[in-house]
Amino acid sequence: MKTKEEFHRIEISKFTEDLREAFGYKIQYRQDLVLVNIRGCNGAGKSTVPMQMLQTDPGAFMLTLDGKDKATVFPSYGFVAMGRYFSKTGGLDGFKNNEETLKVLKLLWELPFSIIMEGVISSTIFSTYCDLFKELEQRNNPKRAVGVLNLLPPFEVCLERIKKRTPEKFDSIKKDQIEGKWRTVNRNAQKFRDAGVTSWDEDNSVIDINDTVSWFFSSIKNNLQPEFTGLRLGVRFPTEEPVKALKKAEKGVKRGKKGRKTSPVAKTLDDNGDGAFLRSLKREIRPHWDPKYLNTPDDNVRLRRDPETGQTLWDMYFINLVERQNIWYRRVIQGKSKPWTDDPVMSTYHFTNVDRRLDRVTLHYIDKVLCNLEDSYESKKFLLLNTFIYRLFVRPETTDAMGYIFPETFEEDWERAKAALRARRESGEPVFTDAYFVNDLKSANPDRANSSNKTENAIHLIQFIIDHLDELAEFTFNPKNSMEEVIEKFTMIPAVGNFNAYEVALDLGIVKEMTGIDFVDWTPDHYANVGPGCKKGIEYVFEDLGNMSHLDIVFFITSVYKGELERLGLEYKYQEGCKELDLRALEGWCCEMSKYFNYYATERGYDWAKGKRPKKKMNLRTDDVSYLNPRISNLVK
């Protein structure tokens, strides 16, 4: 976070006048503006909300009155908080008297921001603020929903927070006075409701500090302003003039031909693109990454924005990534029943897990295929064969019926497997996955006249792999060959394309992690195959890729995702044994977000929509899901 001296400062009146001039003397106001008075005793967590906004918004700046800091603007969140937050006496507690408070509030009301008011002293005052809030509720131009958020965690929690914050002073603190404030806040909460002022209570004792902002937004939406989006305006540059940045972030929606919504201009935060913002992000370069993919965005790179909200699809990518993991966490780890999300798209349509290791099919591979590996070259060679077979069908019921093919009993096992395949087809049972399209495999059948039977084509393909297994194993296990080179080698097999070759390589890349047996020298974090879905997702997020290839962007996203989650106030709930996301996870999420943005953009009639809504509906089971618990790496057991 910047020091006090590093913040941009501007007089409130000058800032307002500059805004009027920038917007043609008519400031554009959002329809979901709010004023929230956060109340609570010491240790209740009032200042945590603006403090978290301050720490996660690099575009934050100060508004002054007579040369003194009087308000903190968080443009990325669309909020301004009365007061400053560089010292313990922040918020409304830094104002001299009520007259100064009302003077600053009057000036801030003209700005296109939602407003936060919070302070310890003001938390116990009722009549003055009740009259003020009822008067503010009647104001227009702009119209703001006004409400009182009463933070009432258990009093013991408040004391524990105070003790943690100032342990050296805790014994001398007058705890009875703090308890008196807690009771006053609780009592006044009902008095506000009786007077007709929107007032609601919240217990934030179990809210992680990194979830504070998103929790705050949800609280507003659920209790004060149903239309509140909590969307960021996307103004990020701490060095950019606030008025210039805000004007770009708040540009109105134009209508193109046929009534489709288009972005005001094909530009985003800066006339020179978003390269400066992207270059400002902290990158974590992993030592095993190939430097040829570690490109740096130039000034031609542009992020796409939602024309209605100004929010970047870049931010939406990370927000939805965390929400998809939250769905998994609530369903599998917490064992909750539906609904697992409030997101209307994710609650309706199917999106795969962020981490491939959590998918049912991959878990089955770990349990039923990897368990057969022994620490010998022959066993490793036949794991390669069985992995190809598994990813050819991607249907556990099929490979379970076939059984594992061992080197010691190869002839018997292979005959049994072929018989099982033919039996499933004859009985009408599905042989191949329905999760995605598997090509007809005709090119694997040398008898083209009899290549209409896809199951027989698959048998021919497996036989080809068996016939060339020594060659494939030698190339795969040669440490001189990279993951990318091995994938290219796999595509030389008839009917095996980049996608299937990549899937096999990914499975091989987790063998050592899951078994502890040395296998190959790569992991899913060494390379990513960028397929059509991933490309489409990237082209949604980026209006212009500039000098970056799609693969460059996958590496770039992976290198900055931790910092971006922190900037957005998001927490990713890693499964046990996992400390970070790999290239495959971020590449795969680009693909999933292409489905999300297809629906999102098409439903809104945006001219950059690239497809229709997802085909597959969410149909996740709510009964026993213990089999979906993550498998723990042998390397961390």
UniProtKB/Swiss-Prot annotation:
The record lists the catalysed reaction(s) as: 5-hydroxymethyl-dUMP in DNA + ATP = 5-phosphomethyl-dUMP in DNA + ADP + H(+)
Any one Pfam family match given in the protein's UniProt record, by short name: HMUDK_HMUD1
Alphabetized UniProt keyword annotations: Host-virus interaction, Inhibition of host innate immune response by virus, Multifunctional enzyme, Restriction-modification system evasion by virus, Viral immunoevasion
The chain's disulfide connectivity reads: none
Biological process terms in GO annotation: symbiont-mediated evasion of host restriction-modification system; symbiont-mediated suppression of host innate immune response
- Example GO molecular function: catalytic activity
Q: Which residues does the annotated region (Disordered) include? A: 249-269
Q: Tell me the superkingdom of the source.
A: Viruses
Question: Manganese among the record's keywords?
Answer: no
The family note in this entry says: Belongs to the thymidylate kinase family. 5-hmdU DNA kinase subfamily.
Q: What is this protein called?
A: 5-hmdU DNA kinase
